[in-house]
């Protein structure tokens, strides 16, 4: 199974795995699963840190890489798909994560309810 972690799930997986529901934690920690984070998650988290809404360790990206998580770049097709999704939800990062998982047929790991608004494959974190 291939997983894409929502921004908050990425941080939980790195620094607070006890916040994850058991099924999500098992899926993320299962060595047979491939675990990705979107370049959009990096953008979102760094924006929040720059605005003072979030405190990030300076080496958090290195920690993600050391854990074995892989970065998923944002493609032009991802941008088109996220813009063409029904407007059930307005957050551009959430829309991007939905688009990225739908086009690749991956599973999005999130605690947010927006995932239920689309025909995406989601695992509740």
Q: What kind of feature is each model-predicted range?
A:
Residues 37-38, 74:
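Short glycine/serine/threonine-enriched helix-capping/active-site loop
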Residues 57-58, 66-114, 120, 125:
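Active-site neighborhoods of divalent-metal-dependent phosphate/nucleic-acid chemistry enzymes
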Residues 1-37, 50-62, 104, 113, ...:
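Short, well-structured N-terminal submotif of metal-dependent ribonuclease cores
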Residues 12-13, 48-49, 85-86, 100:
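A generic structural signal for short
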Residues 45:
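Phosphate/NTP-binding elements of NTP-utilizing enzymes
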């Amino acid at each position: 199974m291939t997983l894409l972690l929502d921004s908050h799930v990425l941080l939980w997986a790195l620094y607070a795995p006890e916040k994850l529901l058991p099924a999500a934690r098992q899926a993320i920690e299962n060595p047979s699963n491939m675990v990705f984070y979107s370049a959009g998650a990096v953008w979102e988290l760094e924006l929040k840190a720059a605005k003072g809404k979030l405190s990030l360790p300076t080496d958090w990206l290195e920690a993600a890489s050391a854990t074995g998580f892989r970065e998923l770049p944002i493609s032009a097709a991802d941008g088109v798909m996220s813009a063409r999704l029904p407007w059930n939800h307005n957050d551009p990062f959430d829309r991007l994560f939905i688009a990225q998982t739908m086009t690749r047929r991956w599973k999005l790991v999130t605690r947010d309810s927006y995932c239920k608004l689309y025909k995406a494959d989601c695992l509740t974190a």
